Amino acid sequence: MALAAELAPGAARLGIRGTVDMNPGHAFFHRRPDRSVDEADLATRAPKLAEFIATACASYGIANQPVAVGFSNGAIMAAALLMTQPDLLAGAILFRPLLPFSSEPQYRLDGTPVLIVDGAKDTRRSPGDGLQLARQLRHAGAAVTYHLLPVGHAVTAEDSAIGSGWLQVLDL
């Protein structure tokens, strides 16, 4: 939530914790022993999360579509939501993502703004993971902005500045 507050100080925020107990921490979906995405689990969990987000927005009187902000596992889930629930989000900021699904998105994302920020020294991702996702989302029609920073996996002040500036330009 601290990152979301930095990115959009005056915006309403909904903090969501994944339901998968990772001990320590939580995730939005299971990973295989080799750390690859369990696509079947992700495909099952994404619609449930989408329903939760829609219900929460309605309950709190949030009329505008939300912009997802996700880091790592959360960025992968946010990308999955874009690909499977195209009317849910107004856009997304994805820090250190990778492809949620090996297949192309099944829906069009015509003009949906997406910011992807990768870390060149990220040892938890393979080089080009974020670029692959950017290509896939662009192919589906999303308006993708991509940045590669000389950093590792952790979110930095530069990430926050890029995300905040991107949101201000979009004025969502």
Pin down the residues of each PLM region.
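Short beta-strand/loop motif that positions the catalytic acidic residue
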Residues: L115-D118, D122
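Alpha/beta-hydrolase-fold catalytic nucleophile elbow
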Residues: R17, V69, F95-R96, V117, ...
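Serine-hydrolase catalytic machinery in alpha/beta-hydrolase-like enzymes
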Residues: M1-N64
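Short, proline-enriched alpha-helix->beta-strand connector loops that line the catalytic pocket
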Residues: N64, L109-V114, A140-A142
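C-terminal catalytic histidine-bearing segment of alpha/beta-hydrolase fold enzymes
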Residues: L131-L172
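Primarily recognizes the serine-hydrolase "nucleophile elbow" in alpha/beta-hydrolase
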Residues: Q65-D110
